[in-house]
């Protein structure tokens, strides 16, 4: 390098760092980045973390039409090999990757999950061998958990829904006191108040599935004031009609709540890739796209190869597929695979054994839009 070039280089201004730009420009740039990357960006500096948590960023995203929906799931991946290993929370990455990204987790066995805006609330559950009164919130942009004021009574597998920006929680308690039937949480005041059966109008929630209560898309059988959670049933809107879907003996089935035809298989799913050879292989179904689609989940064993030979050890892959629906005449529903991928592979090898029955690793899920 010549002396002239050195002088020119030394006189050049230093490059402008992104963090030195005005906040309004930084906000406009961050608003165009997927929220999936926000937890990583929040580690850059305190200024970034403050902007990512700000209402201004949320307003900017809404203004330019950049709101996104994310599926959060809680999976018990080590239930057979490591019973003491707690379940983990994951976020499903956006198209086209569709991989499970682990996030900091809390236990949620028999808990109820609802979301408001960018926050996920974990209500009650089975903790340390007992029903719990806890309320924990996950801030999705930062993936940070914090405790909130506890419920009045312990509950597990309670029904919950968001009505007028308040969280109504019903059932799930062993108490026979009518004042413990339900309670409502106000996120603004962070207070709980009792809810009596005579003061809460559940006409809409009880009209979708006759004889049952529907809250947050989940179905609960009613026995007087007691509720029985019907696990693994999702309500889905198919051409302006609400139908129930569930996994029955490894097969995705559907029914119309007001018809007597019973449960029927969803057609068109025979071509799902990398499924086990047995006809019934699905383990769980969960909501997707705010009740218009579902995701189905299953496990697949991949044998380990050592040189030219296959061993008896295998890795377990977690597969997920998103399914949309279309009615085909009377009493027939066809499913369409929007995407299907291996979303997670367990690191540990284990000896392959044909399972005696399908093991349900899927514990909970919710969709967050913000």
UniProtKB/Swiss-Prot annotation:
Q: Which InterPro entries match?
A: F-box-like_dom_sf, F-box/kelch-repeat_ARATH, F-box_dom, Kelch-typ_b-propeller, Kelch_1
Q: Which PROSITE patterns match?
A: FBOX
Pfam families, A to Z: F-box, Kelch_FKB95
Q: In this protein, which residues make up the domain named F-box?
A: 15-61
Q: Where are the Kelch repeats?
A: 119-165, 167-212
Which CDD domains did the record assign? Answer: F-box_AtAFR-like
Q: Which UniProt keywords apply?
A: Kelch repeat, Repeat
| Lineage top rank: taxon | Eukaryota
Keyword Repeat listed? The answer is yes
Q: Which PANTHER family match?
A: BNACNNG12250D PROTEIN, F-BOX/KELCH-REPEAT PROTEIN SKIP4
Q: What is the designated name of this protein?
A: Putative F-box/kelch-repeat protein At3g46050
Origin organism is Arabidopsis thaliana
């Amino acid at each position: 390098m010549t002396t002239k070039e050195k002088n020119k280089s030394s006189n050049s201004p230093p490059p402008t760092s992104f963090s030195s730009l005005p906040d309004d420009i930084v906000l406009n740039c961050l608003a165009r980045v997927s929220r999936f990357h926000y937890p990583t960006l929040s580690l850059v500096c305190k200024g970034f973390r403050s902007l990512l948590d700000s209402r201004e960023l949320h307003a900017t995203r809404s203004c330019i039409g950049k709101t996104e929906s994310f599926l959060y799931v809680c999976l018990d991946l080590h239930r057979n090999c490591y019973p003491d290993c707690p379940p983990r929370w994951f976020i499903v990455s956006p198209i086209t990757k569709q991989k499970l990204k682990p996030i900091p987790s809390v236990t949620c066995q028999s808990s109820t999950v609802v979301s408001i805006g960018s926050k996920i609330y974990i209500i009650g559950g089975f903790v340390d061998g007992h029903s719990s009164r806890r309320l924990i919130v996950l801030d999705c942009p930062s993936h940070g958990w914090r405790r909130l004021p506890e419920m009045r009574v312990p509950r597990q597998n309670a029904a919950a829904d968001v009505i007028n920006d308040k969280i109504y929680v019903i059932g799930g308690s062993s108490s026979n006191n009518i004042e413990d039937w339900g309670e409502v949480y106000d996120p603004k005041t962070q207070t709980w108040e009792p809810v009596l059966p005579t003061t809460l109008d559940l006409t809409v929630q009880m009209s979708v599935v006759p004889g049952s209560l529907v809250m947050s898309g989940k179905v609960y059988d009613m026995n007087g004031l007691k509720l029985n959670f019907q696990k693994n049933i999702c309500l889905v809107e198919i051409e302006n009609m609400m139908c129930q879907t569930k996994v029955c003996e490894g097969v995705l089935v559907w029914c119309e709540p007001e018809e007597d035809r019973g449960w029927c298989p969803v057609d068109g799913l025979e071509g799902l890739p990398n499924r086990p050879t047995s006809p019934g292989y699905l383990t769980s179904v969960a909501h997707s796209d705010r009740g218009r689609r579902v995701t189905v989940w299953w496990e697949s064993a991949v044998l380990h190869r050592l040189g030219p030979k296959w061993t008896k050890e295998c890795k377990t892959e977690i597969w997920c597929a998103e399914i949309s629906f279309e009615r085909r005449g009377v009493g027939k529903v066809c499913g369409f695979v929007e995407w299907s991928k291996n979303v997670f592979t367990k690191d540990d090898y284990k000896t392959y054994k044909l399972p005696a029955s399908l093991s349900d690793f899927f514990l909970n899920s919710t969709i967050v839009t913000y």
